[in-house]
Amino acid sequence: MPRRARARGGGGGGGEEVKVEDDFIDSVLNFGGGGGGEEDGDDGEEEQQQQQAAAAAMGKEFKSKNLEAERRRRGRLNGNIFALRAVVPKITKMSKEATLSDAIEHIKNLQNEVLELQRQLGDSPGEAWEKQCSASCSESFVPTENAHYQGQVELISLGSCKYNLKIFWTKRAGLFTKVLEALCSYKVQVLSLNTISFYGYAESFFTIEVKGEQDVVMVELRSLLSSIVEVPSI
């Protein structure tokens, strides 16, 4: 590669600076080869040609070291892309750019979820429980002001003298005691009992066992319980 003409000057210091600058430009142009850049390049090409000729003589394909390094780099890159696609739940396109974009979006969503969980943990346990309970109760049952609920009694036979008894009633003082007294008056044995209360109402679930003539007892017991839990007319 041709060298640049060096400036000739009278001052010794200025001449040194120009020489250093020219040497640096030559080294960049010749990729560090200095004055023998062309000779080194020719030697490299000649060596590569000799290697190609030797490989051809042996019936083998000549492989450049730079080419092999590039193939290894691309292999590692493709492996990382495949691993990224395996952990990102939503991939819009199969290109590398789209995979990286989808991964970034997924990371942002995860960061938002972490911030939301941290905010919820920052609330006091009482407030969090109150919000959750209020939301669930509002969705499950929202009574209206003009709604008029009558007492409901349901009996379902389970066989072997056993029944499921469900009673829906408005909570009034002493009402549950009257229900238990009615069951005892017919010698009904209570096997299990669960009660749910909400907004001034209650729903009780009994598993009972009846002795004696079941048909008569069930008809009379249903009538008695209905009269007990029925809402009195105003």
Swiss-Prot record:
Residue ranges with Acidic residues bias: 37-48
Alphabetized PROSITE patterns for the sequence = BHLH (PS50888)
Subcellular locations according to the entry? Nucleus
Which domain of life, per UniProt? Answer: Eukaryota
UniProt KW keywords: Developmental protein, Nucleus, Transcription, Transcription regulation
Region annotation (Helix-loop-helix motif) ranges: 75-110
CDD domains given in the database record: bHLH_AtAMS_like (cd11443)
Chief subcellular location equals: nucleus
Q: Which GO terms describe its cellular component?
A: nucleus
Ranges for domain bHLH: 61-110
Any one GO MF term held by the record is: protein dimerization activity
User: Which family does the record claim for this protein?
Assistant: Belongs to the bHLH protein family.
What is the recorded name of this protein? Answer: Transcription factor UDT1
From what organism does this protein derive?
A: Oryza sativa subsp. japonica (Rice)
Provide the organism lineage as a comma list: Eukaryota, Viridiplantae, Streptophyta, Embryophyta, Tracheophyta
